[in-house]
Amino acid sequence: MPSSLLLATRNQILSMMNCWFSCAPKNRHAADWNKYDDRLMKAAERGDVEKVSSILAKKGINPGKLDVEGRSAFHVVASKGNLECLNAILIHGVDITTSDTAGRNALHLAAKYGHALCLQKLLQYNCPTEHADLQGRTALHDAAMADCPSSIQLLCDHGASVNAKDVDGRTPLVLATQMCRPAICQLLIDRGAEINSRDKQNRTALMLGCEYGCKDAVEVLLKNGADVSLLDALGHDSSYYARIGDNLDILTLLKTASENTNKGRELWKKGPSLQQRNLPYMLDEVNVKSSQREHRNIQELEIENEDLKDRLRKIQQEQRILLDKVNGLQLQLNEEVMVADDLESEKEKLKSLLVAKEKQHEESLRTIESLKNRFKYFESDHLGSGSHFSNRKEDMLLKQGQMYMTCTSPGVPAHMQSRSMLRPLELSLPNQTSYSENDLLKKELEAMRTFCESAKQDRLKLQNELAHKVAECKALGLECERIKEDSDEQIKQLEDALKDVQKRMYESEGKVKQMQTHFLALKEHLTSEAAIGNHRLMEELKDQLKDMKAKYEGASAEVGKLRNQIKQNELLVEQFRRDEGKLVEENKRLQKELSMCETERDKKGRRVAEVEGQVKELLAKLTLSVPTEKFESMKSLLSSEVNEKVKKIGETEREYEKSLTEIRQLRRELENCKAKLAQHVKPEEHEQLKSRLEQRAGELAKKVTELTSKNQVLQRDVEKVYLDNKLLNQQVHNLTSEIKSHYVPLQVSEEMKKSHDVTVEELKKQLLDVTQKCADKQLEMEKLLLENDSLSKNVSRLETVFVPPEKHQKEVTALKSSVADLKRQLLELNKKCGEDREKINALVSENTSLKKTLSNQYVPAKTHEEVKTALSGTLDKTNRELLDAKKKWEDLNQEFVKTKDENEILKRNLENTQSQIKAEYISLREHEEKMSAINQNMKSVQDNSAEILANYRKGQEEIVTLHAEIEAQKKELDTIQECIKLKYAPIISFEECERKFKATEKELKEQLSEQMQKYHVREEEAKKYKQENDKLKKEIFTLQKDLKDKNVLIENSHDMERALNRKAEELNKQLKDLLQKYSEIKTEKEKLVDDNARQTSELLAAQTLLQKQHVPLEQVETLKKSLNSTIEHLKEELKNKQKCYEKEQQTVAKLHQMLENQKNSSVPLGEHLRVKEAFEKEVGMIKASLREKEEESQNKTEEVSKLQSEVQDTKQALQKLETREVVDLSKYKATKSDLETQISNLNEKLANLNRKYEEACEEVLRAQRKQLSAKDEKELLHFSIEQEIKDQQERCDKSLTTITELQKRIQESAKQIEAKDNKITELLNDVERLKQALSGLSQLTSPSGSPSKRQSQLIDTLQHQVKSLQQQLADTDRQHQEVIAIYRTHLLSAAQGHMDEDVQAALLQIIQMRQGLVC
């Protein structure tokens, strides 16, 4: 009872609160909302940072202002996760705790939509984590529902309560299990969430997980020790909720968990006794069988693991099947809900029909009663005599007819009324016979028969219409079933098509992978052929690869089209489902119409049966009709009875009138009695009313309990339906996402297949062409080799004789010739050889002449061979030296690795020192807090000084007034003296005046003494203020030193110094002004004292004169009056001055308190001076050491700059060597040795620096240990020293980084030199081979003049080729550097957490560029 009432009241209050909160902001901000707010909202929705910052720069813009819908720009930015806009708003300044109409602040919205970066930023600005919305949910609740583990971790790290409950008593763990988020459940449990926490209905997270069928979450809860045996408020356990959810897997999990708990309890109960009994027996067996058991346990565990894996697979398959079933059941549920709604509407319609039927039944009963009355009247009329009636009788009969008319219902038709009712005046006709009455009855019968026939015809028509409608309904039902079957078939076809598309996609992916492997093989083949020299084929294959890339991109576009088609198919499926729903609704509507028609048919059939029964009754009554004689006798009897009844009616009417008058009187009396009794109540009636009210209250309470129980049941049903809808939406979303990610439409897959088949066929054709070309080229190569052999034989014959020296020199210069041009020349030479075969006879004749010339012009073969051996020996030496250099470089690399490790150790030491600094020294926040406290003190001092100034001004004004009064008194004394000179008065009155004057003098003297005391007090206060100002100045200087020593920025410290100096100067000026005013007041005081002395002397003189002379009475009285007025005036001024004095005393007391506080917080001067001197000495020592270190660091920086210049010189030298493509090994070794010596020197210097740094750190630590007893100033000085050390350390780190960069550059240059050396050696080998072949060919084919020209042409072409190759290398280097730059920038942005769409697109570009480089 109370819980249900509380729930009802809570729901009402919540609804009221929602309404109030929804209405409040609309009324508040409707008038405040302007165009700039609208622009800011639009910019926030678009995420335009520049626009947002420009609008915020204007005055009066509040980003936390709510619009008509109850949300602000700040909330929109947080919900959309735009970090830059959020930064701009936070920097501008906004109330972080502002909430929207639902009570959610920006932290709630960022957690709800899973924006972890925005959430982190808000937490950095100290946004409260425990703020709850109108549903009582914190940001952790929203993060748990949004499935965002990073935001949950952030909130927990910043102190969010894991066990916070909402209005329904649900924790974040409960909501995570409801939403089926097992990972988040585990995370919350790890963070300390209560597993067995209950909501307001005493349901645990396990119960809700079982109800919503979340197996993974239930597993997580059971693993972490959730209690299975707990019961909710209704007495249900978790297995009951698992049965409601129809999830067998969860039931099995719960059973196993409960069995394990029971087993554990039983073992706990039975364990001690069994162990006590079996201990002596078990010890021997355990020692023997321990090894066997371990082996068996391992085997069993392996078998169990395999079984569990199989079970997991089966369970996953079953889960998928169950998900499909769940989807089907949910659809059925939706249909059943629709059917239930339709049944409820039909119930309401049937109720309305029942009410109408009851009304019709009542009307039919009335009509039957009226008919019975008519038949009775007809019988009485028929049995009466035929005598004539008087006028009275006729009147009576007319009255009776009217009475019967009133009894009958107005809806009865005319043919159903009797003859007496239709024509009541027939009785008055004297010559009417029974024959005419019988004719009328027959006519009425005929009319009734015609009516019955028409009713039968109507019934037949209705039956035909009903049959027609039934047939239509059946046809519609068949159509609905057929449409359902068609839609099911279409859905199945679409599912099959999606499966086929999946298969084709997998096949296409496999084909793509095969193609990629094929492409890689082709690339390798092409690279091998490029080494041989097939540049044309390379270019053709590159073009083919580009074409293939274009086709691949087209295929990816087709895949995109296929995905779009899948989406269209999904939309079609949804349309089919909607059409099915519409058809089901139409079917239900037709069924309703059919039921209505059937009910109408039943009604009309009943009416027809009733009419037939009435007709039969009429026929039976007509058979029992009476003859005319009896009828006339009956008439006479009736007339006599009517006369008697008329008399009786007259008497009754009179009595009725009397009774009416009596009743009126009684009513009046009753009303009077009621009016009297209204004021009094009987105790019996009171008790009766009490009992009735108690009964009524009990009934109402029962009704309330029933209604509350129904309300609870309905709420549960609503919650279940809501959660079912949520689950359905999630499943639909998951299905759509799976279809989008995994499925492809049929058309797209077929197009992909076709395109891939076409590309494969084209590639096959290209491969066949390439293979044919390769075969042709191999045949040509074989021919060329054969010809080469023949030529080499001829060349060997020629070389046995002589080698010319000129050709030898030309061959040495032509070392940079390429393979491709030589092959082309070989082809041309072969052609020319074919042409010149005819000229062989001529060449034989020329051979004899050439042999003669060879002896004179060419070098012998021996010298040539000796030169060759020498060159080969030098090449071997260079190779050996290169290998030695490589080994040395490897050693250097190892040394560099060691130095890197040492650098890492130094970095760790740095981090440790930083942590020590953080632990031992004050942070910026504390410094800022101290500064704020000092500023507050300064403000309070300024306020006090302002109050003192105001009091001083008031004192000046009072002094001015006193001056004026003194002058007035002087004037009055002058007048008195003149009066005394003119007239005289008696001595007695004068003595009285004297006494008064003395009293006034005393009072004035007392006032003057009090003012003097006040002025002395003020002087002392001024001195104190001076001392306080001096102390403040000293504190300001100490603070300035602290600011300089700490990590505060220099600019801020300078600004603070300037501001404080200004304030100090202002205070000094104020003090100077006060001192000047004080000196003026002193002078004025002295003047007043002199004036007072003069006045006293004058008064004494006047007294002496008065003693000698008499004064008149009139003058004395005037003097009395004037003196009394002056005395009253002076008293009022004294009161005012006393008030001012009290105020000043209060201010002085406040200042004293301030001074005492400052004294308590401050240090005495002696100690301060001692500490200061000690610190100054230490600072001097440390500064001297720092200067030495700075000089050393400057020397090191100079050395580093020298090294950098040397490295640049080496780079330039290397570039020159690259242009020449020849490296002097001796210079290289010299530079290498120099660099090694420099590196060793730098390493030694680094070691020295590290030692010095460690020594400095030790010195600092010693100083810290000595000065731990000192106060804050000592620590501040230490901090300044360590800051300077840090600066030097940063410089050292910079120098180390420059050294490492130099080392890296040296390594890179060495690698480049090695690669170039290798290339040079390869080129030299190729050139030597080609040289030999060229020499032979030139001797064979060309005459004496032609070889020089051809060789020059060859050299030119080779140089061009070398230049083109160099350009290509430079272009590739540029591309590589650009790629590296892009890669670094995007990696940095990704590391910082800025993974926006632009960054993702850039990363895709990087991958594509990388693939392009690989290609």
Swiss-Prot record:
Residues 1186-1201 have a biased composition (Basic and acidic residues). GO terms for cellular component: cytoskeleton; cytosol; nucleus. Residues 1186-1205 are annotated as: Disordered. It holds the Pfam family Ank_4. Induction: Up-regulated in stimulated thyroids. Down-regulated by forskolin and TSH. Up-regulated by EGF. InterPro entries: Ankyrin_rpt, Ankyrin_rpt-contain_sf, RAI14/UACA. Highly expressed in adrenal, testis, kidney and large intestine. GO terms for molecular function: actin binding. SMART domains: ANK (SM00248). ANK repeats lie at residues 69-98, 102-131, 135-164, 168-197, 201-230, 617-646. One of its GO terms (biological process) is intrinsic apoptotic signaling pathway in response to DNA damage. Gene3D superfamilies: Ankyrin repeat-containing domain. Regulates APAF1 expression and plays an important role in the regulation of stress-induced apoptosis. Promotes apoptosis by regulating three pathways, apoptosome up-regulation, LGALS3/galectin-3 down-regulation and NF-kappa-B inactivation. Regulates the redistribution of APAF1 into the nucleus after proapoptotic stress. Down-regulates the expression of LGALS3 by inhibiting NFKB1. This is Uveal autoantigen with coiled-coil domains and ankyrin repeats. The gene is UACA.
